[in-house]
């Protein structure tokens, strides 16, 4: 909960981050898992003089799943301002081999307050995939590692956004050498 006052305006924001996770075959090499959760950031009611929106100063970035793409949908509120979001989601993953991990996620995105540039409260659908792998251990020295990361995301925006909305795509690959 966030309670206070700023410039004579009452502040009352809140968030919920709930998750249930199951690991199947924990003794297997693949260690498959699945989870269901919901992330909720209160939104500011446009019909109220109070500010009920969650202030992201107290949130992690990007808190939602794998998303580098979703954070850019908050540009109207200020870049990186996580607020007014209800996001139930499903995720799953496994370890395809000792040095790799694959994760998948899908979420239906909603806006608790209908204050967007569009006519509705449907923020849309999000899907993401992440593959992380250690490519080499000790290539030059005992503690060295070469790691790789591939991330892909898709955001199908809903009626919360303006009519000229388009599907968003994000793809990132990364190589990291640590010593």
Predicted regions and their residues:
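Transmembrane beta-strands of outer-membrane beta-barrel pores
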Residues: 1-5, 24, 38-44, 106-112, ...
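Residues that define the transmembrane beta-barrel architecture of outer-membrane proteins
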Residues: 10-16, 84-88, 121-127, 165-171
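Outer-membrane beta-barrel architecture
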Residues: 17-22, 91-93, 128-134, 174-176
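Repeated loop/turn-to-beta-strand initiation elements of outer-membrane beta-barrel proteins
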Residues: 27-34, 98-102, 136-150
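Predominantly the C-terminal beta-signal and adjacent terminal strand-loop region
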Residues: 136-179
